[in-house]
Each structure stands twice: as C-alpha cells, then as structure tokens.
A protein has these predicted regions:
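RNA-contacting regions in translation and RNA-metabolism proteins
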Residues: 1-189
Length: 189
C-alpha cells in the first residue's frame, strides 16, 4: 500500500471530519473512559473515512449500522445488496479494507482506536464460526490429551480463538508459524 494513496485518501476525508483530537487521544492512551460525545466524534470520523472508501466502489450511500462489539470495539457494518466484492474470497478483500481503513482512522485521530468494518454481517458470522471451531478443538484437545492445531488464520481470527478460550481453564492457546501459515494451537493443561 502506497503512502501516496493513504495521503490522498486522508486529503479527501479531511474537510469532512476536520478537527484536532489530541485531548481524546491523551485520555484514551491514559486508559480513561471516553465520554459518549468523544465516542460519537470517533464514530463520525470513522464513518466519514469509510464512506470515502466506499465511494470508490460506488457504495458510499450504503447504510452503515454502528454498534459496540463484545470487546468494546466500534463495529461499522455496511448493509447493502451486491457488496460481495468488498468481502472477496475467504474475506481477504475485507481484511485488506480493514487494514487500510484502520490506518486511515489512526492517522486522522492521532491514535489507534479499535474500529471494525464488516459487510453484511460477514465478520459476525465468521466470528461465530471461529468461536465454534475453537470450542470443538478445545474439547478434542481435552478428550485426547493432545495438542490441536487449527487451520491458518489471519490475526483477527486468531485473536477470536484466544478470546473464545481464555475462560477455559482446561486448555492453553498460543500461535505458531508465520503468515500466511500462522495458526493457533490448543493444548490441554
């Protein structure tokens, strides 16, 4: 991804979400809870950037549902027909979109706030599938007393596995390998 593309995207978005956010950044980095007003500002910035990206796919007028995820992250779910092109094969296009989007939001705000882009609930469905896969693998690891390796996953999905099993005292999880073959290993205690 070229720095020029990122800078061009930021210039496109800048007038729509003009502002300086050092106070929010300072409070967030200090671990303070952000106010509803500050969270609304972050959401406005993120939605403006997402709409700018969507305009390149002629989808900037698509509805965007905004809600809070289980881990406190802001989730923006683009809901419109014919957006499969934004998901891509096995979600790879959506993963690339997420990386670019996160970089743009971080650059604009001056700090990294967790904002997840979803399309038609794809990530939500995938999250359920990954959590189910993790639970099944944990049960198998406990039953067989052997380590169980899951298939290679991106960083987001590996994190979902670790989160899904962190409350299970009968297993430990860790990641092995390097991308694109990095995967989670589940070991019975």
């Amino acid at each position: 991804m070229s720095e020029e593309i990122i800078e061009d995207m930021l210039e496109e978005v800048a007038p729509q979400v003009a502002g300086d956010y050092p106070e929010i950044a300072q409070r967030y980095k200090a671990g303070e809870e952000l106010t509803d007003e500050e969270l609304d500002i972050i959401a406005d910035v993120a939605i403006s950037i997402l709409r700018s990206i969507l305009s390149h796919f002629d989808a900037d007028n698509s509805p965007i549902d905004e809600y809070e995820g289980d881990e406190g992250e802001l989730i923006l779910d683009v809901t419109a027909p014919d957006l499969a092109v934004l998901i891509g094969r096995h979600g790879r296009t959506l993963d690339a979109l997420q990386v670019m989007f996160s970089l743009l939001v971080s650059r604009k705000l001056g700090f990294r706030y967790p904002v997840v882009v979803d399309v038609e609930g794809y990530k939500s469905r995938r999250q359920d599938k990954v959590a189910s896969m993790a639970q099944s693998a944990a049960e198998r690891a406990i039953r067989t007393h052997k380590s169980v390796s899951l298939p290679p996953m991106n960083a987001y999905e590996r994190r979902l596995v670790h989160i899904a099993l962190r409350g299970n005292d009968a297993v430990d999880t860790h990641s092995e390998g390097s991308d694109p073959d990095r995967h989670v290993v589940i070991v019975a205690r």
